[in-house]
């Protein structure tokens, strides 16, 4: 019975992720106590969230390279914008491109005085769990980043953003206290 409940829970998370992955092209702040390996990496001084964000950038650029497109460059301003949105989705308990203050990604960029000519956003979430349906064990930076990027890749709207005419990418990752990772990608042409 417990096994069935766990399978149902995994299917729910996967279905919810897939359904939310179909959002348009515009797409929070807590601590994580029970996610393994959250301490800083002594070699790089990066948090787990930053390592995951780097892997998401790399995987996105691999997709772009396979299509003969230029790579996106990491941008600190866009990272900040993306991280704030991921944190806010957790803090204010919503999952949407329009935030708790009814602001779109472009409005949030304007609020932070970030210049842009084009902007788009992908959001998603994945549990940090031993057996996520469709993803397997997501309890590493490599596997959880692969899971969310593949989810976006299999969603026409998100994929269009990933291969779109953008120059820069910001990635924000935040975890809930019950180990659900929220992801935001912000694409920009400055």
Task: Describe the residue ranges of each PLM region.
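N-terminal targeting leaders of exported, membrane, and organelle-targeted proteins
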Residues: 2-96, 102, 157-190
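Short secondary-structure boundary/hinge segments and terminal tails
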Residues: 81-82, 100, 107, 127
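A well-ordered secondary-structure block
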Residues: 105-189
């Amino acid at each position: 019975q417990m096994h069935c409940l766990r399978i149902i829970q995994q299917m729910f998370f996967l279905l919810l992720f897939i359904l939310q992955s179909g959002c348009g092209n515009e797409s929070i702040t807590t601590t994580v106590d029970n996610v393994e390996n959250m301490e800083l990496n002594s070699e790089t001084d990066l948090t787990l969230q930053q390592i995951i964000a780097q892997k998401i950038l790399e995987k996105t650029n691999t997709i772009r390279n396979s299509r003969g497109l230029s790579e996106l460059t990491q941008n600190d301003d866009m990272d900040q914008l993306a991280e704030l949105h991921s944190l806010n989705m957790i803090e204010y308990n919503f999952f949407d491109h329009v935030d708790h203050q009814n602001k779109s990604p472009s409005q949030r960029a304007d609020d932070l005085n970030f210049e842009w000519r084009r902007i788009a956003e992908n959001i998603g979430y994945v549990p940090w769990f031993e057996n996520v349906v469709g993803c397997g064990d997501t309890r590493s930076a490599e596997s959880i980043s692969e899971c969310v990027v593949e989810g976006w890749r299999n969603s026409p709207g998100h994929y269009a953003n990933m291969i779109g005419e953008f120059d820069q990418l910001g990635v924000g990752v935040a975890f809930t206290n019950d180990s659900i990772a929220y992801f935001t990608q912000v694409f920009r042409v400055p």
